[in-house]
């Protein structure tokens, strides 16, 4: 997680997360859907909200609470969810740390807690997908590029980011907004 500079958010987390970090929309490269994301750093491989192994932001998004586990669509049935794990990440180990399963084969307390969090997150995921689709259908997303000024004078740019067009948002009727 200390190298994760972008994390997916649920719409229910936006108000709390926006107090600490910038939020943008990006397109999922696999399915083209809009994804609500928070940036923990504008540098890949960096997370400014982890200091000495501890999360320091005011709000801890669900995906940080459950990392390296995550909610995903079932490969066997796209109408169902399942739990995935990032086995390639350095925090995942088969030799050290908390076990996923007890010696009797039952889920560990840690896995049970993560499973409960992820299961309760299914409704948040469904609401977020519906919200993102609605925002897109209303034409409220506009592209934004960010130029970063480094001390050494270099100015890398971030593209592929989208934000809510506040001018368009102000012109919407309440009926359109609350459909």
Region locations from a protein language model:
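N-terminal ordered "arm"
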Residues: 1-43
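Short, basic/low-complexity N-terminal boundary segments at the transition from targeting/disordered tails
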Residues: 2, 43-53, 124-130
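Detector for Asparagine
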Residues: 5-8, 30-31, 47, 63, ...
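Conserved aromatic-histidine-acidic binding/catalytic patches
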Residues: 11, 52, 119, 123
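Short linear motifs in intrinsically disordered
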Residues: 11-16, 60-62, 136-140
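Short beta-strand-initiation
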Residues: 18-20, 59, 66, 143
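Aromatic- and glycine-enriched beta-alpha-beta binding-site module
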Residues: 26, 34-101
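A contiguous, surface-oriented mixed alpha/beta subdomain in the mid-to-C-terminal portion of proteins
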Residues: 71-179
